[in-house]
């Protein structure tokens, strides 16, 4: 099943409002930053701490709605906020939960499932294994930048591996548009070679430009064309 445009639950709208506020406040802090692998948090970021206290579980899972579900987008935003806040412990726990539960234990072998929560039988796990490319791009970006800023080789390697998989599984050549990022790997080709379903909000230009800048020579042109 592909991701669909479900109605927004009030709790998810609150999460989105907090996310947009944090994005507006926090993005300048990352721009132009240079690596300081030994740096600690420079100071309190009250909005990030409020977000974490309200939505982030101790194990690194972000609660997205009243049903206790988690979306890959929420995990990707939390990774970005933790990076901007220089909050390495939270970044590590968010990544660990995301890798264990949405990537089935290995970032290098698959795209993350976009929806996780309680199943009909009462067990908790993946509810929809399709991926959401906006989350995938932000996760790859956060990992690559965390690797650069904190000098963590594993983060850089994971980010680059995920970026390669995004190109392989979530892009297509569209007539008149060229190489294009699809919203996910499954469910967005309406008619093969003729019609596709797109979502322009899934194209964060600053993240795409950064992924193009750090991509291997053989794929840099593909990223630049998105």
Model regions: which residues?
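N-terminal secretory signal peptides
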Residues: 1-10, 14, 18-24, 28
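Short N-terminal micro-motifs specific to bacterial/archaeal maturation
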Residues: 6-7, 69, 81-82, 130, ...
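Structured catalytic/translocation cores of nucleotide/phosphate-coupled proteins
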Residues: 15, 79-82, 94-99, 105-107, ...
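Low-complexity, Ser/Thr/Pro/Gly-enriched N-terminal "stalk/linker" regions
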Residues: 21-26, 32-73, 83-129, 176-180, ...
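Extended ligand-binding clefts on enzyme/binding-domain cores
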Residues: 37-46, 68-72, 133-134, 156-226
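Well-ordered alpha-helical scaffold segments within catalytic/enzyme domains
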Residues: 74-88, 97, 137-152, 203-218
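Substrate-binding cleft of extracellular glycoside hydrolase catalytic domains
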Residues: 103, 108-165
